[in-house]
């Protein structure tokens, strides 16, 4: 059996909500893929003045993405730096904490409960792209190739950069760890250089966590929000395959326009976007992945 269905699953699961400073819609669609391996979080006002959103694109199974979806916010709230409003460090530490939890006996047991097939959980992992909004500051922590794009003055202000093995800095680390990059893949296998999980690539006891073949340490980008900032578009890589960032923002803006933004309007914008991105067939390979997007409208 190949990676694709004979017909796509177009049904969408969409959640909407709002907080003091945001309105959001999170929508996911399995599409042409045999299984759904994406997960996401949406937590407006987890504490006063803080909202958190995240997308997790699984590979090698759905289990790590589901694990992170369940545990990320709880671990972030427990984090000492989070409590001291040191959000950049808190995000980094929470990404690394996910790997720590996955390595525990309890974590391994939970992964097995999530598994859809009898696969080796050591090769399961997920990307993580998490946006934290604190008052007028936006932080985006990223490991992998999911993305966040801020619509600023109706143009794209990119809040993350993909972590690919061919990137010179990433490639140097991989080679220092004893690995190689072939066809854009770590050891010829994984097409990401940073991810949560993927524990088989993180087993060299002589190396620190940020020196392994694959690392969970995210980049964190920070920006001060202005009245010109309209919304954040978050998504797994399947959302970004066929249209560039400016085209994606234009598509969302064509739905919400200058109207009073509501949960229902954002729901329509998110679902319409996924419909447009879905390929009519699998011949080209793009528009065929699982798709998850979160639209976070900023109340200014």
From Swiss-Prot:
**Keyword annotations:** Hydrolase, Magnesium, Manganese, Membrane, Metal-binding, Protein phosphatase
So which cofactors does this thing need? Mg(2+); Mn(2+)
> What binding details are noted for the cofactor?
Binds 2 magnesium or manganese ions per subunit.
One GO biological process this protein is involved in is: signal transduction
Q: Where in the cell is it found?
A: Membrane
What residues does Mn(2+) 2 bind to? 57, 237, 289
SMART domains from the UniProt entry = PP2C_SIG, PP2Cc
Q: Known EC number(s)?
A: 3.1.3.16
Q: How does it sit in the membrane?
A: Peripheral membrane protein
Q: Is the Acyltransferase keyword given for this protein?
A: no
- The superkingdom of the source organism is Eukaryota
Q: What class of enzyme is it?
A: hydrolase
Residue span, PPM-type phosphatase domain? 23-298
Q: How is it modified after translation?
A: The N-terminus is blocked.
- Protein purpose: Serine and threonine phosphatase.
Q: Which family does it belong to?
A: Belongs to the PP2C family.
Can you say what this protein is called? Answer: Protein phosphatase 2C 1
């Amino acid at each position: 059996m190949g990676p694709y269905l004979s017909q796509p699953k177009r049904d969408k699961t969409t959640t909407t909500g709002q907080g003091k400073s945001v309105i959001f819609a999170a929508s996911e669609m399995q599409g042409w893929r045999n299984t759904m391996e994406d997960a996401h979080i949406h937590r407006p006002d987890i504490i006063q003045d803080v909202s958190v959103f995240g997308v997790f694109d699984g590979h090698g199974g759905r289990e790590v993405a589901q694990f992170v979806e369940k545990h990320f916010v709880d671990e972030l709230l427990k984090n000492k730096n989070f409590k001291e409003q040191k959000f950049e460090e808190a995000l980094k530490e929470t990404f690394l904490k996910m790997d720590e939890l996955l390595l525990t006996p309890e974590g391994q047991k939970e992964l097995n409960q999530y598994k859809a097939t009898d696969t080796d959980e050591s090769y399961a992992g997920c990307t993580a792209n998490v946006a934290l909004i604190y008052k007028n500051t936006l932080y985006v922590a990223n490991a992998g190739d999911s993305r966040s794009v801020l619509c600023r003055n109706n143009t794209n202000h990119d809040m993350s950069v993909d972590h690919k093995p061919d990137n010179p800095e990433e490639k140097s680390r991989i080679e220092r760890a004893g690995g190689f990059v072939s066809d854009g893949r770590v050891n010829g296998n994984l097409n990401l250089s940073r991810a949560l999980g993927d524990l088989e690539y993180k087993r060299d006891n002589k190396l620190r966590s940020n020196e392994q073949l694959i690392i969970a340490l995210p980049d964190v980008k920070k920006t001060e929000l202005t009245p010109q900032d309209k919304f954040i578009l978050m998504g797994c890589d399947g959302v970004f395959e066929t249209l560039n960032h400016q085209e994606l923002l234009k598509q969302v803006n064509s739905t919400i326009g200058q109207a009073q933004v509501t949960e229902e309007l954002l729901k329509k914008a998110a679902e319409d976007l996924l419909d447009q991105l879905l390929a009519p067939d699998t011949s080209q390979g793009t528009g065929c992945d699982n798709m998850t997007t979160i639209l976070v409208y900023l109340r200014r």
